[in-house]
Structures are given as structure tokens and as C-alpha cells.
């Protein structure tokens, strides 16, 4: 593999790396390392073994849910990917979520969140507890972020499309943890991205560094005392990395840099490498992931703690309802549907947004004036005076949380064909001999059955992938048209 790198970039890297420069340049001649991160929200006993049987995976040393996969393998095309079983993510970027610490039952903000890798990582750690706000300033990227939040089955996430400065005027001293994976000059992407090589310049590095400081200022206003700020980039430029941390702390001396101890993943190989220290006065406390020292494209990360004592969060309009509450007509229809749900939903958190019924995160906040793409979990909507469950609800449910479940074993040809047919939008006829084998099973209240009527949670290998509606042995497909695959 050959790529032409900008001369000024090479000159700077030669000065920065010294004797390591040749090894760094040599790393550009090898193939990309690719990774996937298992989704804990979908994890079951069978899933890891199923993935291992299909792909030559091995652990990423700094991320217990992360795995490398083979260069010629395509897990992004797998039915399991459509079902949210894992997220495709560059291996070195997986360190960021691991540095967030124990964020269960906390208020967490992913400030520059698209396309959703860090958000899904944080959500997996939170395991449905607390509040996760995922923000993206660019509308099209915010839509992709929202789609990935849905695919990964995240219940407790609010997706916003705002500038950091506007959010900082609302959420003053509010969050326990903020992740800032700031837009950068992308030097860690240059080996695999021609656009990153073409657009690189010293001026762009300078502009990114200045923008990064503005974003950090917004994050500072939103982080409560005692809170944790995780700052990261996918660039090697000191102006955007160590220098950015030094400049920020010079303006806000109440912050200290914390070197979090990472535990090496069981089964990982010594040859896969490990994050290094950085440079400058905080060099021994920040993380540099160099492409010539480990198996990844490269990343920078630092953990900053604001002050010493943890304080109460600001209220951010706390206590104001978002929506107009339950109305009697749809309330009755939803109550009828909810009899099939085997998980309890708090009535205090169920609100309407137009015709949509939403399950808001436990932490209720006032979002008036904020562009919101997804306000927690979309339960469903009123269609012609009947309740129709949303795809997001299906993706968030486990098989044991719904009355009627179709589970398909994708390890067989018969099962894989049924999965592809479902994801293509076809109805599934369980009366057909090809649909009645051991690979395709219908359950009602956990007991295998041959027929049922009404809504069915369609699953693959024990994880949900969408809704169907059954009558006389035929499951009508309710997989969203915009997500359907071409056969």
C-alpha cells in the first residue's frame, strides 16, 4: 500500500519522532487494522461464539468489548450488524469510551458524537441507567447518529443537533462526565483516507486547535465540579493534543490530568501493542496511540478532573415536562399493547411528542428551544386510532421482555435465508415447510408454539431485529422501509 503524505507533515513528524520516524513511515505500508465492538445491551451467551465462528477475531488490548477482525472479512454486511450486535469501530478509537470510568446512573454528554461509536460505547457501560445526551452540530451527521442509537437498542439517550455553545447555555454545571472527541485535522486517518491527506495543511491544524479550545470552553461550562472530561482526537499534531490540554488548564487551573489505569484485555497479544505516554508537561498522564507501536490507526486521549469535590448538578430546567402527558384514547391502546411487554415502564417517564409516545430518560430536563432528534426511547405512535410500536422499541427489547417471539438461528442456511428475507421486507410464512425447521422457532411466554396472533418480536440468534404482525401462520413484515436491504 502506498500513499503520498504532505511534505510539511512529514517534516514535522521527523522532528517529533526522531529515531522512531522510519518505523512510523513504515506503518503506512501495512494494511489497515479493523475492529468491531460488541454491544453489551444485546449480549447473550450465544452471541460471542456465533461471531467467533464467522470471523477471525481477537481481543483489542485496551477495550474488553473490542475485537480485531480479518482484512478481507465484512462483518458490516452481517445480519447481526443490522440487529445491533456490534459496532464497527477503528481499534485505537476504542480507548475513549474506556476512559469514561464508572458512569452508571450518571449524567453523561457526548458532545461531538456522530457517527455514534463513542455514544454506543458509553451506552454499553451505562447499561440503560442515568442520562446520555449525544450531540452533533451537523444535521446530516446527527441523523446518522440517531440511526445508530436506534440500531444499538439504546433506551436512555437524547440526541440533539446543536452547537456546543448553545448547549452550554442550557446545561450549566450539569453533567458528571463529558466526552469531547473533537473535530480535528485527522492525521490518524491519512493512511486510509485520501481526503484527509489532500485537505491537510498547517492552517487547518491551527484552525482545528482553535476550534477545539472553543469546544472545551463549552464543555467546561457544562461539567459539574468533580466531574470528568475525556478529551480525544485522531490526530498527531501537538497543537491539537498535548498543547491543547496545557492551554486549557492554563485558563482553568482547577483541572488536573488523571492517568487512568487500564487493564489489559484477557487473551490479547503482546505484539498488538499498548498506549504510550505523550509529550509536554502532562506527557506521562496522557495517552498516545501510535500506529507504529500498536495495531491501530492512531489516537490521542486525556482525562481531566474538574476541581476536587463532587457537587450537585445544575438543574437545566429540571422538573419541566417534555410533552403533554398521556391522553385517554392512545393510553388505552398502548395499555392493550403493553400487556405483551414483560418489562416495566415508569408512567412518570412516558410522554407524548405529537402522535408519538416516548419513554424519556429518568433524568427529566427542559429541552425547549433545543433541536432534538430523539428524546429517549420511541415506544410507538397513534395510527388511525390504534397503537403501532416503533422499530426503536423492538431494537431495545430482549426476547425475554416480550410475549411473542420469533427466533431465527442464522448459523444454518435455512435460518440465514429467513433473516435476509425479513431484512428485505418480505413476510414470513411459518406454514411453509422451509420455515418450520429447528432453525426457526416461535415462542409465546417462553414456550414453543406453532401459531399466534398479533405483534411478534423478530429476533436473530437471541437478539431483536424488528417487528412483525402475525395472523394464520404468516408474519407480516414491519421492518422499516428505509432500512431494508437488497436481496
Could you tell me what each predicted segment is?
Residues 1-16, 20-52, 297-300, 307-487:
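Polybasic, low-complexity RNA-engagement segments
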Residues 103-104, 168-179:
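A short acidic, Gly/Pro-enriched loop at the edge of an enzyme's catalytic core
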Residues 105-114:
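Conserved class I S-adenosyl-L-methionine
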Residues 115-128:
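Conserved SAM-binding loop of SAM-dependent methyltransferases across substrates and taxa
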Residues 127, 223-225:
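Helix-to-beta-strand junctions that scaffold the AdoMet/dcAdoMet cofactor pocket
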Residues 137-172:
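S-adenosyl-L-methionine
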Residues 140, 177-218, 234-241:
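Mobile active-site "lid"/loop adjacent to the S-adenosyl-L-methionine
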Residues 175, 228, 236-358:
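Class I S-adenosyl-L-methionine
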